[in-house]
C-alpha cells in the first residue's frame, strides 16, 4: 500500500518510479481500497511497517480515525496485537508529535525513526538504508544479511 504522499516523496527523493516499487511486492493494494484483505483482523500477518510514516498517518493511526487502507491496516495491526513499526522521519518534533508517539508506543507500536547508525561505519547512503532496514526486520525476527552487528562486524571486539 502506497499513499499518494509516498508516491510524491518517492519521485522527489529517488530515481525510482512507483511501478518499480510495486514490482518488488507480492501483492499491491490501492490506498483507497479499504475492502482489501489487510483491512480485516482475520487476515493474518506477522505485522506491518509504515516506512516512511508521515505525521498525518501517525496521527490517524493513533486516533483510529483512518482515511485510507494504509492507516486502516495499521489500526487493525494494533487492535490484533501484532507488531507495528512506524518509521516516522519528521524533524523537529513538537510536543503534540511526541505525545502522539508516546500514545502509539503505549498502544503497542514500535517507533523506529530511520536514523543513520554511524557505528556501522556506513560508506554510502545505501549502507545507511541497509542498516535501517536490517534493524527494522530484526523486530520481526527476520535476518537481513547486509546489517552490520555490533561486536561481530563493527565495534571493539570485531
Can you say where each PLM-predicted feature lies in the sequence?
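A cross-family phosphate/adenosyl-ligand binding-site feature
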Residues: 1-85, 91-158
Amino acid at each position: 500500500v502506497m499513499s499518494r504522499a509516498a508516491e510524491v516523496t518517492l519521485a522527489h527523493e529517488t530515481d525510482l518510479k512507483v511501478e518499480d516499487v510495486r514490482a518488488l511486492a507480492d501483492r499491491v493494494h490501492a490506498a483507497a481500497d479499504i475492502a482489501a484483505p489487510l483491512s480485516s483482523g482475520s487476515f493474518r500477518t506477522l505485522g506491518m511497517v509504515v516506512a516512511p510514516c508521515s505525521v498525518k498517518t501517525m496521527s490517524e493511526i493513533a486516533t483510529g480515525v483512518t482515511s485510507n487502507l494504509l492507516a486502516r491496516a495499521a489500526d487493525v495491526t494494533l487492535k490484533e496485537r501484532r507488531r507495528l513499526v512506524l518509521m516516522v522521519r519528521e524533524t523537529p518534533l513538537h510536543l503534540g508529535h511526541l505525545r502522539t508517539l508516546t500514545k502509539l508506543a503505549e498502544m503497542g507500536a514500535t517507533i523506529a525513526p530511520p536514523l543513520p547508525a554511524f557505528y556501522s561505519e556506513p560508506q554510502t547512503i545505501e549502507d545507511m538504508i541497509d542498516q535501517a532496514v536490517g534493524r527494522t526486520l530484526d523486530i520481526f525476527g527476520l535476518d537481513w544479511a547486509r546489517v552490520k552487528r555490533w561486536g561481530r562486524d563493527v565495534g571493539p571486539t570485531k
